[in-house]
Amino acid sequence: MYKETILQNPVFEDFYKFLGSSDSQKIISDNGYVSTKDDTSSYVKENDFKGTINISGSTSLQPLMTLLAEKYETIQTNVDVIVSGGGSGTGYKNAENNVSDFGMISETFNSEKAPSCTSYEVAKDGIALIVNKVNSFDNITLEHLKNIYDCDINGEEKISTWGDLA
């Protein structure tokens, strides 16, 4: 996700174009993610740019974005792309508050979390849950999983065991 005004910067606009190129889509599909763009064309280097692009957010997308950044840096050798994690919440917050130029999220875009941002789907990822068969907790619901990952960030509620979810 990004603020549309950042595309007025030619470096950010060029990286945005690169993300939609067939070059990026090949990296995406070659690394186990689902490409979301059909009939894309190759990235064409129109200018030599110089600058820094900051991207932060989803840790599940971080490895992919790092690969995309590395490829872009081989083409635009005077551009540094800095990719950091922190989770989707960080992606929303940092893009909204101009800490990062682009935010990564691995969920459906929620405009209430970043009202001045626009969503741009680069790829889709999948997350699977595997539970040990000797775990006594069964019938795990989406709400249980949500409680694990949405526990109070201030530490007021700590989920340490499956029993804490019941």
Question: Language-model features: where?
Answer:
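Flexible loop/hinge segments at secondary-structure junctions
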Residues: 1-166
